[in-house]
């Protein structure tokens, strides 16, 4: 164990690591685990064996159990009430959430909207550190997780540009695209098509990192008198229903 305990009422800059006798360095969340670890090791000479990730993200999205439980409960109610309609996710990434849609409703159409290339530095207003996020995916990675990939309709590109020729009703939708424009466009596109008893999940509503998600939701709900229900997952997702 370290011999010195330092009580400090503020935030220490990373360069102070060299001056501190410590046992472990704990990365609170895994969002930037690779980047932080790289800086600690290569810039500040930290022994990688002393780096611990408090909330490792090594098993898909199991750290968001509340969101998954809510999805299962909503699907259970939909089946009990025989709620019919297609399904969609905007912002699929590697398909961890969308695969649950396909697992519980393998016979229904599932539209998958994503660039499958991460953020665009010119088009998407994101922090520079986010530019390389979400690039480690592909259509094959997503479809290989699906119980019935034949009912998955992939729309590669920018939403809502890729939402052409879709006229059916929707029962279950997930919006997980982190940015103001696609979140607002997703609500504007899917809410009128949402059947009574259907649900729209919006991720990152309470995220401090993607604050424009909340802005887009409030703007849409204010214009349409839509009601939201908050979840207790780590990013404070919300559900919109009719």
Task: Briefly describe each language-model feature range.
Residues 31-32, 94:
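Gly/Ser/Thr-rich loops at beta-strand to alpha-helix junctions
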Residues 74-76:
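Pre-Walker A adenine-sensing motif
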Residues 5, 41-52, 224-225:
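Structural alpha-beta junctions
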Residues 21-26, 49-51, 109-110:
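Hydrophobic beta-strand segments of well-ordered beta-sheets in folded domains
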Residues 2-7, 32-37, 121, 210:
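Short, charged/polar "capping" segments at the starts of alpha-helices
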Residues 35-43, 155:
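Structural/interface elements that position substrates and couple domains in central-metabolism enzymes
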Residues 1-31:
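A solvent-exposed beta-alpha-beta segment
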Residues 53-65, 72, 81-242:
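S-adenosylmethionine/decaboxylated-SAM
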């Amino acid at each position: 164990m370290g011999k010195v305990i330092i009580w400090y009422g503020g935030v220490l800059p990373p360069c102070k690591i060299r001056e501190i006798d410590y046992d472990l360095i704990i990365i609170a969340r895994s969002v930037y685990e690779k980047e932080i670890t790289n800086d600690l090791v290569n810039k500040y000479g930290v022994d990688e064996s002393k780096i611990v990730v408090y909330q490792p993200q090594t098993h898909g999205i199991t750290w968001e159990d509340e969101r998954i439980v809510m999805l299962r409960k909503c699907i259970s109610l939909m089946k009990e009430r025989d709620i019919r309609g297609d399904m969609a996710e905007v912002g699929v990434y590697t398909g961890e959430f969308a695969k649950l849609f396909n697992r519980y409703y393998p016979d229904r159409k599932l539209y998958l909207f994503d660039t499958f290339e991460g953020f665009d530095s010119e088009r998407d207003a994101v922090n520079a550190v986010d530019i390389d996020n979400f690039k480690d995916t592909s259509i094959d990675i997503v479809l290989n997780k699906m119980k019935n990939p034949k009912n998955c309709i992939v729309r590669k590109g920018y939403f809502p540009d890729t939402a052409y020729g879709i006229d059916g009703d929707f029962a279950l939708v997930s919006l997980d695209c982190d940015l103001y424009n696609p979140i607002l466009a997703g609500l504007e596109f899917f809410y009128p098509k949402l059947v009574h008893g259907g649900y729209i999940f919006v991720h990152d509503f309470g995220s401090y990192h993607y604050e424009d998600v909340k802005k887009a939701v409030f703007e849409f709900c204010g214009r349409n008198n839509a009601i939201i229900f908050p979840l207790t997952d780590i990013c404070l997702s919300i559900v919109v229903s009719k």
